[in-house]
Amino acid sequence: MALPILAVLVFFLVLPIVMIVTVSFWQATEFSIIPAFDLENYEFLFGSNVTYKVFFNTFKYAFITWVFTLSIGFTVAYFLAFHIRSLTWQIVLFLLCTIPFWTSNIIRMISWIPFLGRNGIANSTLISWGVINEPLDWLLFSDFAVILAFVHLYTLFMVVPIFNTMMRIDKSLIEAARDAGASGAQILWNVIIPLTKPGIMIGTIFVVTLVMGDFITVRFMSGSQSANVGRLISNDIALLAYPSASATAVVLLLTVLIVIGIMLRFVDIRKEL
């Protein structure tokens, strides 16, 4: 029984990674790719200031998106788990949260463009209310637009694991804390949050890995004025520089694995899996 599963994992997970690592050591010319062991791609990658700037942008997007998705996701999950008593209404409201995911990421992302544009709904409304006199140019094709799109796209990935963890919390623990005289804030901080840490960590892994590997959102929502690692890899692929793209992908993969490894040292998520 385990052999077919192992074969699937090797074929669809291990083998592609091995191929990417292998190609990252090859050489590329204007006309061909030469299979050879060479560190030139990594030397160029780590010797370029652009690499460090792009990785900084990637971590910046991941961190800011994580802060907002965690804040929104925890609030929504808390409301569904502890303020909605009816299971039917919990299911209905949870399904409402998933409605945007019935369309593709690109459609949901592009839907912000007419809203945030210079002559879009947001600027027109603010001008009509007298809040501003001139349209705000930074609403679209900026880091603000990129992060807004990320939060919109990936908040549900934070809501689901947190909500799942909260639903497993024994309500008698909360009642016992309340009977002991604990305030709502104390119950939240000392009971709910510690018991929700595995769900928070799973959501964090989802959001951080998705943001760090994304390139379409940065391309469209920044107007090609910003870049992250995913965009860097995409550009290399467009130029048929597959060895360079593979080297960048390997570094990104190792970076994500290190980040996840650090996070897993603080929270044991095995009980949630």
What kind of feature is each model-predicted range?
Residues L80, F163-R178, S246-L273:
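C-terminal transmembrane helix and the adjacent membrane-cytosol boundary/short C-terminal tail
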